[in-house]
Regions:
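Sec-dependent N-terminal signal peptides
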Residues: 3-15
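C-terminal/domain-edge helix-coil "capping" segments
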Residues: 22-42, 161-250, 283, 294, ...
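Extracytoplasmic
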Residues: 23-25, 66, 70, 74, ...
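Extracytoplasmic/secreted cell-surface and envelope-processing proteins
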Residues: 38-41, 96-100, 142-145, 222-223
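Short, flexible helix-coil linker/hinge segments at the edges of structured domains or between repeats
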Residues: 92-110, 155-178
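Amphipathic beta-strand/beta-sheet edge segments enriched in Tyr/Trp
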Residues: 130-174, 305-317
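C-terminal basic regulatory modules in eukaryotic proteins
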Residues: 287-317
Length: 317
């Protein structure tokens, strides 16, 4: 009996280990930090509807810096060894470069109103990584020995909130190879870092992904958010739909007037009922289809504003 009992315990432990190994893991993409890009002059000007902003130029960085590519490759290897799927920055930058300039401008078919999307938002939307690993580093040299000081941050690609971090300085080494110095520096902190990544993703699986829905009314529209349908104002109708479709009914109505509503901390499922991955645009399109059907019959233009934010404009397309 005791022998059978021990066999049962071993079997359960093996099943737990297999289940852990097969647990869903977040998709990662490694990028250089904004500070690193600025220090090494990898920046570009972006015209954000009349306001010039300086943003990282990842295309120039991965095309020019061998050090950056070596660092990204090493982190990719370290994370892949721990079972995390990865999106490669260089390949995603290339795919975005192949998109035509005309596709970067979205216009209303009726009014001609336009909204632009920044290269960084487009990169995140195209790559569809769950978490961005933001890396900055400095090589220190003392006599014949070198070490590396690093700062690795994990950012939720949808909410841009930091979910994990690791920083420190490695021990002095006679090796001059950057990937070796990086691996020596991060090895003591990597397991705890990975645990925090997985804990965040497990929370997303349980409580949904956090996104933002920005709702507006076209100037030419005959409808606003105070128009009533069967005794309920349109904004109440939308509130009820979100409550029915958000994970655990969780969302926050941050601001609202008769012509705009801002929903933050909208918790959407990671996966659709058919098992396909769910994103902000897909969730927003479900809401748009609901509003476009009877009894509302409201045309809705749905526009991506980055991976974790969507703009819905009611009244025309």
């Amino acid at each position: 009996m005791k022998y059978k009992y021990l066999l049962s315990i071993v079997f359960l432990m093996m099943c737990s280990a297999i289940a852990y190994g097969q647990a869903k893991k977040p998709t990662l993409m490694v990028v250089p930090s904004d500070a690193w890009c600025k220090e090494h002059h990898f920046e570009q000007a972006f015209d954000n509807q009349g306001t010039t902003e300086m943003i990282p130029d990842y295309k120039a960085a991965v095309s020019t810096s061998k050090e950056l590519n070596a660092v990204i490759s090493k982190i990719n290897i370290l994370m892949a060894d721990r079972g995390f799927p990865l999106k490669d920055l260089q390949q995603n930058v290339k795919s975005i470069s192949n998109l035509s300039a005309e596709d970067r401008l979205i216009r209303s078919k009726t009014s001609g109103a336009s909204i632009t999307e920044s290269p960084l938002d487009r990169l995140r939307r195209t790559a569809k990584a769950d978490i961005i690993l933001d890396i900055d580093w400095t090589v220190n040299t003392v006599g014949p020995k070198s070490s590396i000081t690093y700062n690795l941050r994990a950012l939720d690609a949808y909410s841009n909130k930091q979910v994990a971090g690791a920083e420190g300085t490695g021990k002095g080494s006679f090796s001059a190879e950057l990937p070796v110095l990086l691996e020596e520096a991060v090895q003591d902190h990597m397991d705890a870092f990975v645990e925090r990544l997985q804990a965040h993703f497990d929370d997303l699986l349980t409580n949904g992904r956090e996104v933002v829905l920005d709702m507006r009314i076209f100037d030419t529209s005959a409808v606003d958010f105070e128009k009533e349908y069967n005794g309920f104002e349109l904004n109440e109708v939308i509130d009820n739909w979100l409550s029915d479709n958000c994970v655990n009914h969780r969302f926050s109505k941050s601001d609202a007037t008769e012509t705009m509503i801002l929903y933050e901390q909208v918790r959407i499922p990671l996966y659709k009922t058919n098992g396909m991955a769910q994103d902000t645009y897909g969730f927003a399109r479900e809401l748009a289809r609901f509003l476009g059907a009877a009894p509302y019959n409201i045309p809705v233009k749905t526009i991506n504003r980055g991976l974790g934010r969507c703009l819905l404009i009611l009244g025309e397309k």
